[in-house]
Design a protein with these regions (language model features):
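Phosphate- and other anionic-substrate recognition elements at nucleic-acid/protein interfaces
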Residues: 1-130
Length: 130
């Protein structure tokens, strides 16, 4: 079996599919194969719970999401002020990548979080400015 070697400063990647009431979160830890899933309600208590969970990894954290209406703004602000690197994924690029990876236009929140994570892994993300 091949041992996975990861740089000490490799960031934890966090992909978030934004929605009105709840956000689907997919977390990829550099030295682990399994990914962690979370559902975060669109309220401050859950934002704090997510920020605390991310700080516990003791590594740099990079968060990316697709801007969806104004629903992303509160969470993005909270994560940015908590010291995390916040990125944006283009809606058009996300749709095209989802179609290419899944050979389908089918869309659901966990699948979108996986596609956002894939886009982060290949570096297809933009700086977030609010």
């Amino acid at each position: 079996m091949t041992k996975i070697i990861v740089a000490q400063d490799a960031p934890v990647l966090v992909a978030i599919d934004i929605a009105k009431a709840r956000h689907e979160v997919l977390i990829a830890i550099p030295d682990k194969k399994r990914r962690r899933r979370l559902t975060v309600l669109n309220e401050l208590a859950d934002f704090n719970r997510l920020a605390t969970a991310l700080k516990e990894y003791g590594r740099p954290v990079r968060v990316a999401f697709e801007a969806t209406g104004n629903y992303h703004r509160a969470l993005a602000y909270h994560l940015a002020t908590s010291g995390f690197e916040v990125k944006l994924v283009s809606s058009v690029a996300l749709a095209r990548t989802r179609e290419a990876l899944n050979n389908s236009w089918a869309k659901n929140d966990p699948k979108d979080a996986q596609v956002i994570l894939h886009m982060m892994e290949i570096g297809n993300e933009q700086y977030y400015h609010d």
